[in-house]
């Protein structure tokens, strides 16, 4: 290993955020930002070294206090223009190189501020001899072409040197460059370029459709909704929109209050249904199941159905229907019983008792009513027992129920019959 060049530097600056460069130096890169640079200069010893290795490789180091490596770049000797490039402006040398240390290709930057022009020129010549790419850094557009005076130390003659976009060639190590207003930090140059781009982009008017306004709904408040959009290297654009929350509309859902039509029979029973009208409750029709001869079945109304009936009619009724077996002409007898009940309602004089039966009384299977025996006809095969009817319960009748009952013809006929009976009772 041979130390080809070693120079003490005055200031070291490093760009903290590497740029993703899949195409190397030909990639579209974001301009560096001035606040992303870190500087190191005070109370320390900094040294820039170029080492030649036996394996035809070059090692570039920046050493802190002769012990800590700030930069450690290993390159092959020869054509390195695709891996590392230098930009020079006395007394600053800037370097950018491609690193694949952590997988993807990243572009890293650092720069050095040399103590004087002599050290600057010696370092530039050493890099040029190793075939590194050296470019002249430009401070601004106005100074893209600058004429400087070059003073030679040997003969004292003045040579006119013109700086341009081409790669500069340095052949005389004793040459001193006398420049005026050319010393500028590269980070400051990048800041000027970013500000220039932001000023150019600020004049562009964006369409209103491209800005999406996010609205939040809160009750009884006016909100300032902020929508921000940020472009590359442009300041954040903030738009404040005054919005009012939308009113929340709640539509109540009507729940069907009709009880489920479910009946339970024995496994060997026939699944036939018959509707029987009763005068002891507002529900004039009940569905009962016809069972075979020799079987008795008690139909109990479930608690859920009772709660639904209470919410609709306001009555606490628990009817229990007992079906006694009969013959094939049971349907005809039931219709005759229905006609007898209707005749008693229309002609109260013919009936033995004009008063309506009490709902709290029980009709037993043998025909007794409150210990008063009443012979039940043998042809009657249906006995109905009604218990626990509370007339004082709070009635909850909805408009929907009233509309349905008014459309029910049978219910209206029953109401008319009850009205005629009551009128005749009051006339007496």
Swiss-Prot record:
GO terms for biological process: meiotic DNA double-strand break formation; reciprocal meiotic recombination. Residues 255-278, 307-380 are annotated as: Disordered. It is found in: Nucleus; Chromosome. InterPro entries: Meiotic_Rec114. Residues 255-266, 346-355 have a biased composition (Polar residues). Disulfide bonds: none annotated. GO terms for cellular component: condensed nuclear chromosome; nucleus. Keywords: Chromosome, DNA recombination, Meiosis, Nucleus. It comes from the Eukaryota. Belongs to the REC114 family. Interacts with MEI4, MER2 and REC104. Component of the MER2-MEI4-REC114 complex. Required for the production of double-strand breaks (DSBs) in meiotic recombination initiation; not required for mitosis. Plays a role in activation of the DSB nuclease SPO11 at recombination hotspots. Prevents accumulation of meiotic double strand break intermediates and is needed for the proper timing of the first meiotic division. Component of the MER2-MEI4-REC114 complex which seems to be required for meiotic double-strand break (DSB) formation. This is Meiotic recombination protein REC114. It comes from Saccharomyces cerevisiae (strain ATCC 204508 / S288c). The gene is REC114.
